[in-house]
């Protein structure tokens, strides 16, 4: 039997919102496999079906740089928040984001680019910064968006300096409409993305392995139902899931009575042309490494737009 530690039980509780004894039982049933325990609890109806809470432990900065119809976002990690507030570290993150605008959008391409004002590559500059400050740092990831017509809107949450913060979002709006209107709308949608963390633009973009996992959970929770009933249950359950995780189907943070898709349709008349989201990127600092975000994060972002 696996050693079920208090720390493992605590982590499962934080992921699912289930009670302590239920979490212990789930871990015992799954031999200490955390992900299997999450599914076990959901099949028993003891855990929320919502996405896992974003938990991060890495410090550093997310930097955003935009220039009209193209923009980039990078994440640079450090060991401590103290270093993230260092002028040299911030200057590096900002320059890395600017450089990313003119690269191929890959991490390798950015690392190999020449750092402004020197003969060093970006990676060499970072290595020298590590030696100077005395703390390990990593250029973790980069993304770039472009549109031929329209705007790339951006938003930085937890901003500590211009374009630098804890969460960076880019939203590509494709349209021949009024640029000023599109910029305002794009920023609102970027704030929405920061708050709700959608995993895909629409249902077609959701990983099929995830869809199958959700379908299996629905089937096991409703085992014994006739086939025709089960099919409707799975279909309905997936529709609800897509409303949680796909950007176009989510209720708009700034007006919960409408979905993002409905907001875009209404925007066409005001913009003077159809408006479509070509893509979006959301980088949260240290995503995937342990540290809990505040419980009222969505409300916090929404309140900032009022």
UniProtKB/Swiss-Prot annotation:
Keywords: Cytoplasm, Elongation factor, Protein biosynthesis. One of its GO terms (molecular function) is translation elongation factor activity. InterPro entries: EF-Ts_dimer_sf, Transl_elong_EFTs/EF1B, Transl_elong_EFTs/EF1B_dimer, Transl_elong_Ts_CS, UBA-like_sf. PROSITE patterns: EF_TS_2 (PS01127). One of its GO terms (cellular component) is cytoplasm. Residues 80-83 are annotated as: Involved in Mg(2+) ion dislocation from EF-Tu. Its main location: cytoplasm. It is found in: Cytoplasm. Pfam families: EF_TS. The keyword Cell membrane does not apply. Belongs to the EF-Ts family. Associates with the EF-Tu.GDP complex and induces the exchange of GDP to GTP. It remains bound to the aminoacyl-tRNA.EF-Tu.GTP complex up to the GTP hydrolysis stage on the ribosome. NCBIfam families: tsf. This is Elongation factor Ts. It comes from Methylorubrum extorquens (strain PA1) (Methylobacterium extorquens). The gene is tsf.
């Amino acid at each position: 039997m696996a050693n079920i530690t208090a720390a493992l039980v605590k982590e499962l509780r934080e992921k699912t919102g289930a009670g302590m004894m239920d979490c212990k039982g789930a871990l015992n049933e799954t031999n200490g496999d955390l992900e299997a325990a999450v599914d076990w609890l959901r099949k028993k109806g003891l855990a929320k079906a919502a996405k896992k809470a974003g938990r991060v432990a890495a410090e550093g900065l997310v930097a955003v740089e935009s220039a009209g119809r193209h923009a980039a976002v990078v994440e640079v990690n450090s060991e401590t928040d103290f270093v993230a507030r260092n002028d040299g570290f911030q200057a590096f993150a900002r320059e890395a984001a600017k450089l990313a605008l003119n690269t191929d959008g890959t991490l390798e391409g950015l690392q190999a680019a020449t750092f402004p004002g020197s003969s060093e590559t970006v990676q060499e500059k970072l290595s020298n910064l590590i030696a100077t400050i005395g703390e390990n740092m990593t250029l973790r990831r980069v993304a770039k968006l472009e549109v031929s017509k329209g705007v790339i809107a951006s938003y930085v949450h937890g901003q500590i300096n211009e374009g630098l913060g804890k969460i960076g979002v880019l939203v590509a709006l494709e349209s021949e409409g009024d640029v000023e209107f599109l910029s305002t709308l794009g920023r609102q949608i970027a704030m929405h993305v920061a708050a709700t963390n959608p995993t895909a633009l629409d249902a077609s973009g959701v990983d099929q392995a995830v869809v199958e996992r959700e379908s299996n959970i629905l089937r096991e929770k409703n085992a014994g139902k006739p086939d025709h009933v089960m099919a409707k249950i799975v279909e309905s359950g997936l529709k609800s899931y897509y409303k949680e995780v796909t950007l176009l189907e989510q209720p708009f943070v700034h007006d919960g009575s409408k979905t993002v898709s409905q907001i875009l349709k209404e925007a066409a008349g005001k913009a003077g042309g159809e408006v479509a989201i070509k893509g979006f990127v959301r980088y949260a600092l240290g995503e995937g490494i342990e540290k809990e975000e505040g419980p009222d994060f969505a409300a916090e972002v929404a309140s900032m737009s009022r």
